[in-house]
């Protein structure tokens, strides 16, 4: 056991994605609201620290809970617990400690609403998704997507102290995006989930129908993302949302024609950066905020 194993159970790429989501939303919340004074650099640092602790702790608890099924899946069989590189009780203690620390840290150094949404993210990922829905319901990832939304809502409330309609809608975008993203991955590794007895959508309804669900979800995601203009976003956001969402739509349409693991992986690689791009667009739009020149 060492730092490498602790880093691995923390899932640093997911930590980075959620911290980017929270920080860009914090910036947008500050820029688009009339509240004064806004957050300073220390507030951003505190949000990054609390978000990283929460995400890493949740990931560690996910590793702990899934220790019985990870050996059955090629993708996860070499994780630290099933490979014997770290003790399961160490991972449990680490996950509980830093998850709890994240909520306390946010409460005292940011504000109560931010601490609440960080706690919501931890609870929805660890309890609702990992411990309950993942092994029992084919819609598991749909409901579990609320964990990603919570990161955005935490960022907004860290800036404003409250969650208004625009802040809620921006965060809910993560929830809408999650099925399109994760079902592509599930199509790629369907055999793993089947071997582990996890009822992911491709296991339950097959590859062809899952590809149609992905396309249907993306057909909801694209207009939803564009509709945010009507609630306060501007031209910079709109242009980037059209381009990135349009590319996803093309690949997900092609996936319905070629519902194979290999093409699902290509679609996944297009879908994966969407969230980072769209939240960068939120931040850029907040910085420049050019209103769209046509009345809606």
Curated annotation (Swiss-Prot):
It catalyses: heme b + (2E,6E)-farnesyl diphosphate + H2O = Fe(II)-heme o + diphosphate. It is a multi-pass membrane protein. Pathway: Porphyrin-containing compound metabolism; heme O biosynthesis; heme O from protoheme: step 1/1. The chain crosses the membrane at residues 14-34, 41-61, 86-106, 108-128, 141-161, 165-185, 230-250, 274-294. Disulfide bonds: none annotated. The keyword Zinc-finger does not apply. InterPro entries: Protohaem_IX_farnesylTrfase (IPR006369), UbiA_prenyltransferase (IPR000537), UbiA_prenylTrfase_CS (IPR030470), UbiA_sf (IPR044878). Its EC number is 2.5.1.141. One of its GO terms (molecular function) is protoheme IX farnesyltransferase activity. One of its GO terms (cellular component) is plasma membrane. NCBIfam families: cyoE_ctaB (TIGR01473), PRK04375.1-2 (NF003349). Converts heme B (protoheme IX) to heme O by substitution of the vinyl group on carbon 2 of heme B porphyrin ring with a hydroxyethyl farnesyl side group. This is Protoheme IX farnesyltransferase 1. It comes from Cenarchaeum symbiosum (strain A). The lineage of its organism: Archaea, Nitrososphaerota, Candidatus Cenarchaeales, Candidatus Cenarchaeaceae, Candidatus Cenarchaeum. The gene is ctaB1.
């Amino acid at each position: 056991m060492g730092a490498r194993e602790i880093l691995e159970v923390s899932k640093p790429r997911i930590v980075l994605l959620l911290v980017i989501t929270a920080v860009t939303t914090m910036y947008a919340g500050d820029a688009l609201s009339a509240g004064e004074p806004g957050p300073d650099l220390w507030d951003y640092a505190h949000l990054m620290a609390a978000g990283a602790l929460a995400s890493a702790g949740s990931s560690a608890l996910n590793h702990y809970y899934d220790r019985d099924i990870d050996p059955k899946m090629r993708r996860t069989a070499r994780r630290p617990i099933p490979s014997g590189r770290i003790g399961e009780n160490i991972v449990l203690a680490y996950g509980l400690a830093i998850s709890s620390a994240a909520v306390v840290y946010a409460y005292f150094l940011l504000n109560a609403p931010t601490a609440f949404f960080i706690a919501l993210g931890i609870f929805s990922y660890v309890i609702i998704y990992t411990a309950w829905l993942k092994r029992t319901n084919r819609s598991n990832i749909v409901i579990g997507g609320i964990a990603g939304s919570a990161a955005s809502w935490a960022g907004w409330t860290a800036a404003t102290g409250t969650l208004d309609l625009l802040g809620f809608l921006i965060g809910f975008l993560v929830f809408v995006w999650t099925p399109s993203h994760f079902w592509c991955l599930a199509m790629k590794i369907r055999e793993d989930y089947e071997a582990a007895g996890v009822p992911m959508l491709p296991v339950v309804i097959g590859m062809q129908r899952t590809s149609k669900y992905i396309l249907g979800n993306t057909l909801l995601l694209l207009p939803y993302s564009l509709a945010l203009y009507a609630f306060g976003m501007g031209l910079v956001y709109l242009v980037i949302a059209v381009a990135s969402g349009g590319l996803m739509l093309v690949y997900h349409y092609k996936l319905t024609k070629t519902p194979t693991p290999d093409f699902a992986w290509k679609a996944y690689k297009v879908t994966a950066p969407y969230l980072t791009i769209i939240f960068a667009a939120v931040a850029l739009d907040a910085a420049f905020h050019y209103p769209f020149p046509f009345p809606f």
